[in-house]
């Protein structure tokens, strides 16, 4: 629970089950809650749309040829400029393999968009000739909701090399990390509670 002794202790005389220290020495230890389904972080939804424009909807490969001179010139820029320039190049490509030799041939969505007020992402195609091996998608509709499970798996398949080309640091900012799969739980020492009549209650200012 939220007051698991492994997350640290705040009561005098008790010992933390993680570090073995008393309340005066224990710094507290973060826990986490695993979500039943991935959830898109609304703050990063526009960045997610840009990432999806850069990689194949089916095989997750980068849509541009990394060996061309124009891409090599882009790699000399800072990460933010690199990401924007690569996105602009990829948005012109309609089919995976159009600019590379190892593409799967899948038609790419015409656009990605979201409905106002919610964090669900949708994709829309020009015509119904795209294919996918995933049962989560309906290939009989030009416009469809993209399940967050599918999005997470698609982003997870992006190689570290392609992440670097897009301007991401694969050690600290993988694309799939923009989708929540767990929620952090701060230790009790960071969310102090108030005792009243032998009961512990959350502090109104910090809970």
Model-assigned labels for residue ranges:
Residues 1-207:
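Conserved core architecture of multi-subunit DNA-directed RNA polymerases
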């Amino acid at each position: 629970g939220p007051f698991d002794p492994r997350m640290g202790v705040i009561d005098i005389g008790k010992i933390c089950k993680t570090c073995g220290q008393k309340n005066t020495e224990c710094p507290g230890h973060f826990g986490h809650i695993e979500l039943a389904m991935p959830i898109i972080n609304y703050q990063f939804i526009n960045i997610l749309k840009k990432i999806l424009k850069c990689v194949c909807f089916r095989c997750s490969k980068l849509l541009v040829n990394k060996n061309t001179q124009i891409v090599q010139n882009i790699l000399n820029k800072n990460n933010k400029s690199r990401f924007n320039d690569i996105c602009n190049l990829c948005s012109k490509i309609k089919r995976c393999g159009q600019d590379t030799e190892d593409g799967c041939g899948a038609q790419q969505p015409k656009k990605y968009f979201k409905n106002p007020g919610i964090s669900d992402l949708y994709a829309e195609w020009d015509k119904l000739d795209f294919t996918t091996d995933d049962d989560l998608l309906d290939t009989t509709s030009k416009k469809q909701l993209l399940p967050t499970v599918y999005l997470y798996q698609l982003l997870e398949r992006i190689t570290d090399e392609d992440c670097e080309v897009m301007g991401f640091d694969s050690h600290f900012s993988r694309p799939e990390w923009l989708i929540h799969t767990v929620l952090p739980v701060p230790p009790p020492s960071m969310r102090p509670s108030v005792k009243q009549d032998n009961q512990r209650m959350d502090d109104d200012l910090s809970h």
